[in-house]
Amino acid sequence: MNLYDVIKKPVITEKSMIALEAGKYTFEVDTRAHKLLIKQAVEAAFDGVKVASVNTVNVKPKAKRVGRYTGFTSKTKKAIITLTADSKAIELFAAEAE
């Protein structure tokens, strides 16, 4: 798996915006990615960023209905990235935080 295929998109929710103040960034990642691969992908994608820890959450699929047909959304994986104290901030979240 290529490092640039690991991170899919940032998660922009109220809870993730509050976690930004503590230096924690939330991304949706590939379901096959493990913590070491996620750490390497974040450090490769953003210059000057050093990852202190990675926490992952498997998000279960939700049941959805379209008319009388029921189906499920896709399962996803979220990664909560904590940066070191001497690390640069990720600029991707700068516009959303303001």
UniProtKB/Swiss-Prot annotation:
Coiled coil: none annotated. GO terms for cellular component: ribonucleoprotein complex; ribosome. One of its GO terms (molecular function) is rRNA binding. Pfam families: Ribosomal_L23. GO terms for biological process: translation. InterPro entries: Nucleotide-bd_a/b_plait_sf, Ribosomal_uL23-like, Ribosomal_uL23/eL15/eS24_sf, Ribosomal_uL23_CS. One of the early assembly proteins it binds 23S rRNA. One of the proteins that surrounds the polypeptide exit tunnel on the outside of the ribosome. Forms the main docking site for trigger factor binding to the ribosome. This is Large ribosomal subunit protein uL23. It comes from Streptococcus pyogenes serotype M1. The gene is rplW.
